[in-house]
Design a protein with these regions (language model features):
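P-loop/Walker A phosphate-binding loop and immediately adjacent motor/lid segment at beta-alpha junctions
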Residues: 24-30, 83-101
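Glycine-rich phosphate-binding loop used to anchor ATP phosphates in small-molecule kinases
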Residues: 38-57
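Inter-motif core of Ras-like GTPase G domains
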Residues: 53-76
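Beta-strand-loop-alpha "switch" segments that mediate conformational coupling across diverse proteins
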Residues: 10, 97-99, 109-144, 153, ...
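P-loop/Walker-type NTP enzyme "switch/lid" segment
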Residues: 1-44, 135
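Short, conserved loop/helix-junction motifs that constitute active-site signature segments
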Residues: 63, 85-90, 113-117
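Short, hydrophobic alpha-helical segments
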Residues: 157-168
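Anionic-ligand binding region
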Residues: 67-70, 76-91
Length: 169
């Protein structure tokens, strides 16, 4: 089937997260899974939604990442956090939920473009199709393959591929 295959990890509450982080067996299982999966499927892209500075369980996965995307929304809270963040060499900022009709979004984005932040040139716009797909419990591509967000995700993939290939070669 064409499109993206998604394996959702789900939401882990704080108590379970602490238990997972403290469990040596959980760490071993995750490391084994990651190693086995990447050996069996070396050309597969794996996207992980993590908070690496707060998540010791996946810290080694983040260290092995070819590309790290720090997802942000053009707003004051994110602006403050970006200015406090130290970026890794393989880390880029991905603007998410951008609304072209929002003056504040335009102002922050324009200001960020003049900064030294390592920006991904693709920005993901706010798209109602995503909310509708979630409500329908369908992947976005299956729900509405021709929506703007699917096109932007494809563009993001096209931008990431040369970076991945240059790091492999």
């Amino acid at each position: 089937q064409n499109g993206y295959q998604i394996l959702p990890f789900g939401v882990v509450n704080s108590e379970d997260k602490l238990h997972l982080q403290a469990s040596a067996a959980a760490n071993q299982h995750l490391q084994h899974f990651f190693t086995t999966f990447t050996q069996q499927y070396p050309d597969t892209l794996i996207f992980l939604d993590l908070q690496p500075e707060h998540d010791t369980l996946f810290k080694s996965w983040v260290a092995k990442a070819n590309i790290v995307l720090t997802v942000t929304t053009p707003e004051s809270n994110c602006h403050i956090r970006l200015n406090q963040h130290t970026f890794a060499a393989n880390e880029y900022i991905l603007v998410n939920q951008f609304c072209a009709t929002s003056q504040i979004h335009q102002d922050f984005y324009q200001f960020w473009q003049t900064s030294q932040f390592p920006f991904c040139p693709i920005k993901l716009h706010r798209d109602e199709a995503l909310l509708e797909a979630c409500a329908s419990r369908l992947p976005l591509y299956d729900y509405r393959a021709n929506c703007m967000l699917v096109e932007e995700i494809n563009q993001l993939l096209q931008w990431c591929l040369p970076l991945l290939l240059s790091k492999k070669g």
